[in-house]
A protein has these predicted regions:
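Enzyme catalytic cores with a strong preference for nitrogen-chemistry domains
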Residues: 1-156
Length: 156
């Protein structure tokens, strides 16, 4: 912190639909660059590890497994950095698919925040694939990348 301020950045890496490995590599590059510039918190777009427009592929367990593996790679490869990172990915919670922000730092996943308001008009069709956070109104824990992680729309 300098003068009481926290340096925050947002990044929009190149993304290939359903190519979690590529998307993870691009995300990791941006995290490393931001950390090198003294950024303390970096946020990425929703579903950046899978791509937003996967459509019915979100129902495929292979995509969900690859997204989790991609997250694990990023978390492990950036464990020596101080930066707090927030990435977007689908996460299965008690047989419901959630569109989540995943927060991590120094090799530890700090929490999951599921999306609350899912659009369902014009080109947006999120309610077809995802469940809003109101389905899990209370804080809970989920297992992600071998870690037990708190999850809540009100996670602080």
């Amino acid at each position: 912190m300098r003068f009481g301020f926290v340096k925050v950045a947002s990044a929009i890496p190149a993304v290939k639909v359903a190519d979690c490995k590529f998307n993870a590599q691009q995300t990791e590059k941006q995290i490393v660059i931001a950390d090198g510039k003294g950024v303390q918190i970096i946020a990425f777009p929703e579903l950046n590890l899978t791509g937003y427009s996967c459509g019915d592929l979100f129902a495929q367990s292979l995509l969900l497994e690859q997204a989790e593996f991609a997250l694990m790679q990023i978390v492990n490869n950036t464990r020596q950095l101080d930066i707090i990172s927030i990435v977007g990915m689908p996460v299965m919670v008690n047989s419901t698919l959630m569109n989540c922000a995943v927060i991590f730092q120094k090799g530890k996943i700090l929490g999951l925040v599921p999306k609350t308001y899912l659009p369902n008009y014009k080109e947006f069709y999120e309610q077809r694939w995802f469940t809003p956070s109101v389905a899990h109104p209370d804080s809970t824990t989920v297992r992600l990348c071998g870690q037990v992680v708190p999850m809540s729309a009100r996670l602080l």
